[in-house]
Amino acid sequence: MTRIAAILLAAATLAGCIFHDRRSFGSVIDDQNLELSIIDSINRDKELALKNHVEVVVYNGVVLLIGRTSTAELSARAEQVAMGYQGVRRVVNEIEVGPRIDVGDTTSDKVLSTRVKTGLADIVGIKGFDPTRVNVTTEAGVVYLMGLVSQEEAERVVEIARATPGVQRVVRVFEYTD
């Protein structure tokens, strides 16, 4: 019975998210399945999973890889894993070579993402803009922005992200509606 309740809660949550999303329901589900599959494959690769930190974000078939690996070869391997899945339209590999990120840095990144998302709620004057359509992910102070947005929306989102204290750099991974 608990499993059914969890499934119903997940479905209700997903339905609420999809209401605001410019992607189709099928695309949202496909993105989630792709993300989970790629993460699983990376975690099953013992060399990639050990002493490396790779995060995967998928939006509209575009895969963003961020984090750190100990070698460029491992970064390339993570990219190859992602490219091996049907439905992947493009892979953006932003994995850096270097030591694994500390837990404290990860917490700071989550706070930074929250600050940027909060700032997006202040965007007014753009007809139809919904800040929930923008995916904000932060790694080592670098903010990655994904979503299906207009050029005007993208410019405002980037402007707000850059103005957020603590942001080192902003990387656009948008797809444009116009």
Regions found by a protein language model. Give the residues of each.
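N-terminal targeting leaders
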Residues: 2, 8, 13-178
